[in-house]
Curated annotation (Swiss-Prot):
The lineage of its organism: Bacteria, Bacillati, Bacillota, Bacilli, Bacillales. Inactivates the A compounds of virginiamycin-like antibiotics, thus providing resistance to these antibiotics. This is Virginiamycin A acetyltransferase. The gene is vat. GO terms for biological process: response to antibiotic. Keywords: Acyltransferase, Antibiotic resistance, Plasmid, Repeat, Transferase. Its EC number is 2.3.1.-.
Length: 219
């Protein structure tokens, strides 16, 4: 998809900011079919490393997925720890099988491992620098993760969390306004409509966005 200069960057352009070789749109860089990323989500690398370098212990045999929505901002050094990092916990945690030389016969089956499922990140999520996201975590739309947080549990939509251990800081909006943002789902609108309404999206003018959405639904 090619957009002219009046309609924002091309989401298929890996390096969308001229002269900046660190900030990269993620989707066009992905080669792993178990990593699914929406358009316009970016990773601001430290030294030009690829986003996939930040997804650790992601083994095909396990089949877990990393799923990220649209318009997410992911800070430098953020890492995603997938289920392959988990060791057995019902006896010794030492991974004898990795060293082979006769120990390979003690390879655990998947049912023996404490698998947590996919990592799922919603849309319009802001993740600060050097955040660690653990296996199976679900982060809701519009959430903010403070720098250097270790995310070990689910994060509700439009909430702010941080720290290690992870702590809830506050909601970004009242419950009613959060429900309105979630119902609106502006990130799923056609890009032409998003561009026309960017002032309202950026300024959080939910009432104007609701009126605009109603007009669209009525046409």
């Amino acid at each position: 998809m090619n957009l002219n200069n009046d309609h924002g960057p091309d989401p298929e352009n890996i390096l969308p900011i001229k002269g900046n070789r660190n900030l990269q749109f993620i989707k066009p860089t992905i080669t792993n079919e178990n990593i699914l990323v929406g358009e316009y989500s970016y990773y601001d690398s430290k030294r030009g490393e690829s986003f996939e370098d930040q997804v650790l212990y992601h083994y095909e045999v396990i089949g877990d997925k990393l799923i990220i929505g649209r318009f997410c901002s992911i800070g430098p050094g953020t890492t995603f720890i997938m289920n392959g990092a988990n060791h057995r916990m019902d006896g010794s945690t030492y991974p004898f099988h990795l060293f082979r030389m006769g120990w390979e016969k003690y390879m655990p089956s998947l049912k023996d491992l404490p698998l947590k499922g996919d990592i799922e990140i919603g849309n319009d999520v802001w993740i600060g620098r050097d955040v660690t996201i653990m296996p199976g975590v679900k982060i809701g739309d519009g959430a903010i993760i403070a720098a250097e947080a270790v995310v070990t549990k689910n994060v509700a939509p439009y909430s702010i969390v941080g720290g290690n251990p992870l702590k809830f800081i506050r909601k970004r909006f009242s419950d009613g306004v959060i429900e309105e943002w979630l119902a609106l789902q502006w990130w799923n609108l056609d890009m032409k409509i998003i561009n026309e309404n960017l002032p309202f999206i950026i300024n959080g003018d939910i009432e104007m966005l609701k009126r605009k959405r109603k007009l669209l639904d009525d046409t």
